[in-house]
C-alpha cells in the first residue's frame, strides 16, 4: 500500500509539472513566482530594459529581445542647444530632420531634397552628374529608355523617390523613346514638381524678374562683408536672362551698390584699366578691379590707418607678406601672472520678510511745544482742586485731606458729634436742637 501511494504521488507531481509547462490559454500568461522581493525587483528592471523587435510581415516569428543600454548622465541639466529657434517666443526644440540645410556635393550620386533650402541647385548638379554617366558609361549605353528611367529613380530617395516611383501611367506613357532624352525629361519633371518652373518662356521670364528685383534691393554698407556681397550678387546676376542683362546693363549695379567713398575711386580705377587693356568689361573684370584697388589702398603707407578702418584690410586674402618685419616693443609687454581661476559662489542674503501693508502710516507734523497753562512761568495760576491762587494742583496742601473735607460738610449740614454716653438705641436716633427743651420730648 505504501509503495502504491508513493507511485501515485510521483505521478501527480509529474502531471503538475507537465500542466505548468503547457500553456492552455495564450492570452493569459502567468508571471513567475519569486522567492524573495529582491529577485522580483531585479527581473522587473531587466524586463523594462528589453523591447520586442519583429516585423509585421512575419506573423509566426518569435519576438527577439534587444537590450537597450542607457547612457550614464553626469547631471540633470538640459543639454545646450547651439541653434535655438524663436528666441522671442517660448523655447521649442526642432528635430534635426526638419531643419532646412544646404546640402554639399558629397552626396551628388543620390538625389535627396528632403528639408533642403537650395533645391534647384541640387537637382541641377544631380542632373549634370548622371547625364554624363549615361552618355559615357558602357553599361548604361545599352539600357532602354524605360530602364534608364528606373535607373534614375534608383538614384533618388526621400520625397523625390516617392514622387518618381508613384507616377501615374499617363505620365509614364510620355517617356521619350530616345534614351538620351530621358534624363532631360526626368529633370524637367523634378523642377516642375519641387521648384514650380515650367519649360515655357513665361516661366523663365518670371524667375528672371525675381532675381533682378532681389539684385536691385541688395545693399552693402560695410566693406568687411565684401565677399558675401559679391557671392550673392553673382548668384542673382547669372539667374537673369542674358538678353535682359545686356538691355538693363545689370553689371553697372555692382559699383552703384558700394559705399560712396569707394564708388568713385573704383570706377576711375576700372576705366583706367580698360583703356590700358588690362581687364575686360565683364562682371569678373569689375570684381577683379575692385579687389586690386582694395589691396593697393591697404598697402599705401599714407592712407594705411584710414584704409584699415574703412576698407577692412584685415580680411583681404591676397596680401603681400611681411615676414619678420614687425618690431617688438618690450615696454608694451607686461608680465602676466599665472593664476588659477577660483569660482566664487556669492552668499545669499536672507532678508526677513516684512509686510509693508501692516505698517501704520503717520503723517509728519511740524514740531512745536505744548502750550503751558502758565506761560509766564510764575505761580499766579489758580489751583484746580482748591481754586486758590499761589500754587499748582500737584502742590496743593488740601489734595490728600479728604477726611477733613467730609467732616466740614457734616458740620455745615448741622450735625454734631455725640460726646455723652448712649444708654439705649433710641438715644442714638434722637434729634436735638438749641431751641428745644426737655419737656417737649
UniProtKB/Swiss-Prot annotation:
GO annotations of cellular component type: host cell; host cell nucleus; T=7 icosahedral viral capsid
CCHC-type ZnF: 381-398
Taxonomic lineage: Viruses, Riboviria, Pararnavirae, Artverviricota, Revtraviricetes
A molecular-function term among this protein's GO annotations: structural molecule activity
Main subcellular location of this protein, as a coarse class: virion
Localization per record: Virion; Host nucleus
Keyword flag Metal-binding: yes
Family stated for the protein in its record: Belongs to the caulimoviridae capsid protein family.
Record bears the keyword Zinc-finger: yes
Protein's name in the database: Capsid protein
UniProt source species: Soybean chlorotic mottle virus
Function: Self assembles to form an icosahedral capsid, about 50 nm in diameter, nm, composed of 420 subunits of the viral capsid protein. The capsid encapsulates the genomic dsDNA. Following virus entry into host cell, provides nuclear import of the viral genome. Virus particles do not enter the nucleus, but dock at the nuclear membrane through the interaction with host importins.
Oligomeric and partner information: Interacts (via nuclear localization signal) with host importin alpha.
Intervals of motif Nuclear localization signal: 77-79
Keywords recorded for this protein, A-Z: Capsid protein, Host nucleus, Metal-binding, T=7 icosahedral capsid protein, Viral penetration into host nucleus, Virion, Virus entry into host cell, Zinc, Zinc-finger
Ranges annotated as spanning the membrane: none
Gene Ontology biological process terms, A to Z: symbiont entry into host cell; viral penetration into host nucleus
Region described as Disordered: spans on this chain: 26-63
Pfam family membership, one: Caulimovir_coat_dom
Amino acid at each position: 500500500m505504501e509503495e502504491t501511494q508513493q507511485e501515485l504521488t510521483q505521478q501527480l507531481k509529474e502531471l503538475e509539472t507537465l500542466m505548468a509547462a503547457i500553456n492552455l490559454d495564450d492570452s493569459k500568461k502567468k508571471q513567475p513566482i519569486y522567492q524573495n522581493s529582491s529577485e522580483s525587483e531585479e527581473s522587473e528592471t531587466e524586463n523594462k530594459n528589453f523591447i520586442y523587435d519583429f516585423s509585421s510581415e512575419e506573423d509566426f516569428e518569435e519576438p527577439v529581445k534587444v537590450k537597450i543600454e542607457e547612457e550614464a548622465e553626469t547631471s540633470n541639466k538640459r543639454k545646450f542647444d547651439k541653434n535655438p529657434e524663436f528666441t522671442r517666443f517660448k523655447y521649442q526644440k526642432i528635430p534635426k530632420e526638419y531643419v532646412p540645410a544646404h546640402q554639399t556635393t558629397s552626396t551628388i550620386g543620390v538625389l535627396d531634397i528632403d528639408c533642403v533650402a537650395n533645391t534647384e541647385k541640387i537637382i541641377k548638379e544631380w542632373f549634370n552628374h548622371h547625364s554624363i554617366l549615361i552618355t559615357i558609361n558602357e553599361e548604361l549605353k545599352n539600357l532602354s529608355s524605360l530602364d534608364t528611367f528606373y535607373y534614375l529613380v534608383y538614384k533618388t530617395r526621400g520625397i523625390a523617390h516617392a514622387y518618381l516611383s508613384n507616377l501615374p501611367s499617363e505620365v509614364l506613357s510620355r517617356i521619350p523613346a530616345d534614351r538620351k532624352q530621358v534624363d532631360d525629361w526626368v529633370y524637367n519633371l523634378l523642377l516642375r514638381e519641387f521648384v514650380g518652373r515650367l519649360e515655357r518662356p513665361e516661366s523663365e521670364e518670371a524667375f528672371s524678374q525675381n532675381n533682378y528685383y532681389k539684385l536691385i534691393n541688395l545693399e552693402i554698407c560695410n566693406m568687411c562683408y565684401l565677399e558675401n556681397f559679391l557671392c550673392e550678387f553673382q548668384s542673382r546676376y547669372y539667374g537673369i536672362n542674358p538678353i535682359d542683362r545686356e538691355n538693363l546693363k545689370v553689371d553697372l549695379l555692382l559699383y552703384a551698390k558700394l559705399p560712396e567713398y569707394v564708388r568713385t575711386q573704383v570706377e576711375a580705377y576700372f576705366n583706367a584699366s580698360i583703356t590700358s587693356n588690362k581687364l575686360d568689361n565683364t562682371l569678373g573684370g569689375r570684381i577683379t578691379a575692385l579687389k586690386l584697388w582694395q589691396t593697393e589702398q591697404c598697402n599705401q603707407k599714407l592712407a594705411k590707418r584710414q584704409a584699415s578702418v574703412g576698407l577692412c584690410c584685415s580680411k583681404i586674402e591676397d596680401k603681400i607678406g611681411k615676414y619678420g618685419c614687425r618690431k617688438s616693443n618690450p615696454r608694451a609687454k607686461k608680465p602676466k601672472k599665472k593664476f588659477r581661476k577660483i569660482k566664487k559662489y556669492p552668499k545669499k542674503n536672507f532678508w526677513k520678510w516684512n509686510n509693508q501693508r501692516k505698517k501704520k502710516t503717520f503723517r509728519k507734523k511740524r514740531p512745536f511745544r505744548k502750550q503751558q497753562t502758565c506761560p509766564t512761568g510764575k505761580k499766579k495760576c489758580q489751583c484746580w482742586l482748591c481754586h486758590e491762587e499761589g500754587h499748582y494742583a500737584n502742590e496743593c496742601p488740601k489734595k490728600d485731606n479728604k477726611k477733613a473735607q467730609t467732616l466740614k460738610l457734616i458740620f455745615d449740614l448741622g450735625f454734631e458729634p455725640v460726646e455723652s454716653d448712649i444708654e439705649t438705641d433710641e438715644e442714638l436716633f434722637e434729634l436735638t436742637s438749641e431751641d428745644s427743651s426737655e419737656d417737649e420730648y
